Regions:
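Membrane-helix interface motif
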Residues: 16, 132-143, 148, 220-232, ...
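Core transmembrane alpha-helical segments of multi-pass membrane transporters/permeases
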Residues: 25-58, 83, 243-308
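Hydrophobic core segments of alpha-helical transmembrane domains in multi-pass membrane transport
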Residues: 4-13, 41-46, 80-85, 123-127, ...
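Membrane-core helix-loop-helix motifs of multi-pass transport proteins
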Residues: 104-209, 368-371, 377-384
């Protein structure tokens, strides 16, 4: 809000109706993002906490790394992170779970410890976040509201992009590891006692992976079967359409069912359910409020006269909506240092125009969805 107020002062002076812009513009954008995505953030955070408490996430990561072994340490960590995040486990939980496993494997394979962050990031923060069809990550969910799509939008583009990200990422990490070995650099003399983890008494892999299968199958069923065959005209009373909300509803239902499944199958193991739910809900607040604050700031920018200049510049880059969208989403995500917040700002301001342009060129809204999602994972990782 402070940056929004400063922006108003810089562009309109002290006659810019600061409080009106704060309560009616900034807070409207802020609250609207929460209205649209709080259920997703909350259910997803609870799911991540339940997967952690039931040791399902640890079991999946341990199973993959054991099967691939130390000779394929980098690939093992990448695939573990990919499967967990594709299943809906939050990025932060995945990093926490994978770090001790990666440390153990890298030490055995004598791979530099400094490559662990990049290895975890490739599996957890790249193709499953923005590219892989069906991913419940928020960066793949936000475009649905604007383009009337679902999480499986443009599957071929998504799969091709995923393969490219995985392949190029693995090539780079492997090259760095080999280069380090040639230079005589190994894991190093690091004391890792503090990150030792007990992997005994983990649940079997079938039980651990079932919640992820439930999310995928349920999301697919509701997105492609159930909501495709019902009459959504009643939603006109609520000022929306079925195509705008069905994708989000499908993901919410899928995650809730997975949450319920974990609880019911771990009644003896999960001792304090209320505490776990409290922590899960609390964990959802920070990323939700951060993204909402950024989107609120975007609402203020959109209301200013200078936005017309920005909009003209963006659309002047290319008359092709795909190219223009890719550049604008990347740019705004880079400026805000947030994939979800920048994506929300971009699409809230520009999606209607892109949709109109794509219709004139006979471009499917699914392609716009996938390009927007992919672009959100670009410049958001700049050092700032």
């Amino acid at each position: 809000p402070i940056i929004a107020i400063i922006t108003i002062i810089l562009t309109t002076g002290f006659n810019g109706h600061l409080m009106a812009n704060y309560t009616e513009v900034y807070m409207s954008g802020f609250a609207n993002f929460i209205k649209n995505y709080f259920p997703l953030f909350m259910t997803g955070a609870i799911f991540a906490k339940l997967m952690e408490e039931a040791n399902y996430a640890k079991s999946i990561a341990h199973f993959i790394t054991q099967k691939l072994g130390k000779d394929k340490s980098i690939l093992a960590v990448v695939l573990s992170g990919a499967l967990l995040t594709y299943g809906g486990v939050s990025l932060f939980v995945v990093a926490f779970i994978l770090y001790p496993i990666a440390s153990m494997l890298f030490k055995e394979a004598d791979i530099p410890k400094r490559l662990i962050p990049g290895t975890i990031a490739l599996g957890a923060f790249t193709f499953t976040m923005t590219a892989l069809p069906g991913s419940p990550e928020i960066q793949n969910v936000i475009p649905m509201k604007y383009f009337g799509t679902d999480t499986f939008a443009a599957p071929i583009i998504g799969i091709v992009a995923s393969v490219m990200m995985l392949t190029l990422g693995m090539l780079w990490l492997t090259k760095r590891a080999k280069s380090a070995k040639v230079n005589g650099e190994g894991y190093g003399n690091h004391s890792d006692k503090s990150i030792e983890t007990d992997y005994s008494n983990l649940p079997n892999i079938f039980s651990a992976i079932l919640p992820i299968i439930i999310i995928f199958v349920t999301n697919l069923f509701f997105s492609k079967v159930y909501y495709e065959n019902i009459d959504g005209s009643y939603l006109s009373e609520f000022g929306t359409t079925l195509s705008s909300v069905s994708g989000t509803w499908s993901v919410i239902i899928a995650i809730v069912l997975a949450d319920v499944f974990i609880v019911l199958t771990n009644l003896k193991k999960i001792k304090n359910l209320k505490s776990i739910l409290d922590i899960g809900v609390t964990n959802s607040f920070r990323p939700l409020l951060n993204s909402s604050a950024i989107v609120g700031y975007g609402s203020v920018i959109k209301s200013l006269a200078v936005f017309g200049v920005i909009q003209s510049f963006i659309f002047g880059i290319s008359s092709n909506p795909i190219i223009s969208e890719a550049l604008s989403v990347n740019l705004i995500c880079g400026l805000t240092a947030s994939a979800s917040g920048g994506l929300g700002i971009s699409l809230d301001a520009l999606a209607p125009t892109y949709l109109h342009m794509s219709q004139a060129l006979n471009i499917s809204p699914e392609i716009l969805h996938r390009i927007a999602s992919l672009s959100s994972g670009g410049l958001d990782t700049l050092p700032h």
